Amino acid sequence: MSLFYPTRDEVREFFFGLWAKSRAGEALTPLESMALAIVLEHPEYHEVLGDPERHREREWPPEAGEPNPFLHLSMHLAIEEQLSIDQPPGIREAVRRLEERHGSAHEARHATMDCLVEMVWQAQRNAAPFDNATYLDCLARKL
């Protein structure tokens, strides 16, 4: 799996595999451990992760109103990676302040995810680089 640009199938296999490994009590890599902590906060996705044959090719169109679990978990993982290296600089402090406001680290991550999704969409739509300053401004507006 490419660490920076995984395919849809690679992302799904990563989450299916880590769920199976965790259920079997197998050792996890540091990245898998980080991802497992996120998965454990989302029991609504455990059935999906436990049944790869049924869900490997499943689509979650936005108009259906049900979030794509793999996209959601991947966004959480991206945020945790950003926080671990404070990239963009200042995100740790911004998310810490969101945690205070929301009273929950998980809810702060969801608020952060709203901004991250918007920034990725803008970058793709405009064929432009990710705008760190606008991302941090979006987080500040959530306070």
Q: Each PLM stretch: what is its role?
A:
Residues W121, R125-L143:
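Glycine-rich, aromatic-bearing surface loops/beta-hairpins
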Residues T29, E47, P89, H106-H110, ...:
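Short, solvent-exposed positions on alpha-helices
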Residues M1-H46:
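N-terminal leader/targeting peptides and immediately adjacent processing regions
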Residues L31-E99:
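Aromatic-anchored, charged helix-turn/loop surface patch used as a conserved interaction hotspot
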Residues M113-M119:
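Helix-rich interaction surfaces within compact, conserved domain-sized segments
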